[in-house]
Amino acid sequence: MRNYEAVLIFKPESELLAEGREFVKGLFNDNGCKVVKEEEMGERTLAYEIKKNSKGFYLLYQIESEPENIQAFDKALKLRGEILKYLFVRKEQ
C-alpha cells in the first residue's frame, strides 16, 4: 500500500458538506483504504470561481491505498455535485 494525500474542495453549504463527507468516508472504506488523518482546513475564498462558487470548504485526507483504487476514486468523485475539485498526490515514504 502507498501513502497519498487527498485535498477535496466542497461547496460550503452545510447539508451538502455533511453528505459529501459521509460519501468520501464510505468510498475510502469500501475500497479498503485506511484513513490515517482527516483535517478540516475550513472555508476559504477560491482564487477563481469553480462551478459558480467563489468559496469552498477544504478537507485534507492522508490515506493508505493501492494505486488502482485512486482511479476508482477519480471516477466516483467526478459524479458528485457537492465536490468542486479534488487532488490526490502520492507521498514519498
Residue ranges of predicted features:
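Long, contiguous binding/interaction regions
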Residues: 1-56, 64-93
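S-adenosyl-L-methionine
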Residues: 61
